[in-house]
């Protein structure tokens, strides 16, 4: 897991991640439509979404097997829960078809609050629970870059 802000990219950030974030900065605006946008076909693409955050207890943890996530908050605020422990057995396993598995929660979860411009990177296998409300549920606009790793 890596956390940062798109307006202050650290020099140690891997080049491929930096390039993907720079692409979002250069091409995504408030008018960019929701949905999937290709950068390099299915190897590298991003999803624009506008969703309501929900109470922590209502959200399910997830992880991926093939794709890395770069989750970028474009507008609003989001609680992002994560675990540094192995996922364990999922209760919903769609890894083969959709590269996502769900479980009720991660082991020893921790939460970070992401504001506009903040990003978090989750590598395959890293458990995370996005769209957790910070206080009352609120709308958040995000870009999620998907980078094929396996």
Curated annotation (Swiss-Prot):
Keywords: Acetylation. The modification N6-acetyllysine is found at residue 36. GO terms for cellular component: cytosol. Pfam families: DUF386. InterPro entries: NanQ/TabA/YiaL, NanQ/TabA/YiaL_sf. The keyword Acetylation applies. GO terms for biological process: single-species biofilm formation. It comes from the Bacteria. Induction: Induced by simultaneous deletion of five TA systems (MazF/MazE, RelE/RelB, ChpB, YoeB/YefM, and YafQ/DinJ). Gene3D superfamilies: YhcH/YjgK/YiaL. Disruption phenotype: Deletion increases biofilm formation after 8 hours and decreases biofilm formation after 24 hours. Belongs to the TabA/YiaL family. Influences biofilm formation. Represses fimbria genes in 8 hours biofilms. May act in response to the combined activity of several toxin-antitoxin (TA) systems. This is Toxin-antitoxin biofilm protein TabA.
């Amino acid at each position: 897991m890596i956390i940062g802000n798109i307006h202050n990219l650290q020099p140690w950030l891997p080049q491929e991640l930096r390039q993907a974030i720079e692409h979002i900065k250069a091409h995504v605006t408030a008018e960019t439509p929701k949905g999937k946008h290709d950068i390099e076909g299915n190897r590298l693409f991003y999803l624009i979404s506008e969703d309501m955050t929900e109470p922590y207890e209502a959200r399910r943890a997830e992880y991926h097997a093939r794709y890395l996530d770069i989750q970028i908050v474009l507008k609003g605020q989001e609680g992002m829960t994560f675990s540094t422990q192995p996922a364990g057995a999922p209760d919903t396993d769609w890894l083969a078809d959709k590269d996502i598995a769900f479980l009720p929660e991660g082991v020893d979860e921790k939460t970070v609050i992401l504001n506009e411009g903040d990003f978090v990177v989750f590598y395959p296998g890293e458990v995370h629970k996005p769209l957790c409300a910070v206080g009352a549920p609120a709308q958040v606009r995000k870009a999620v870059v998907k980078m094929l790793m396996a």
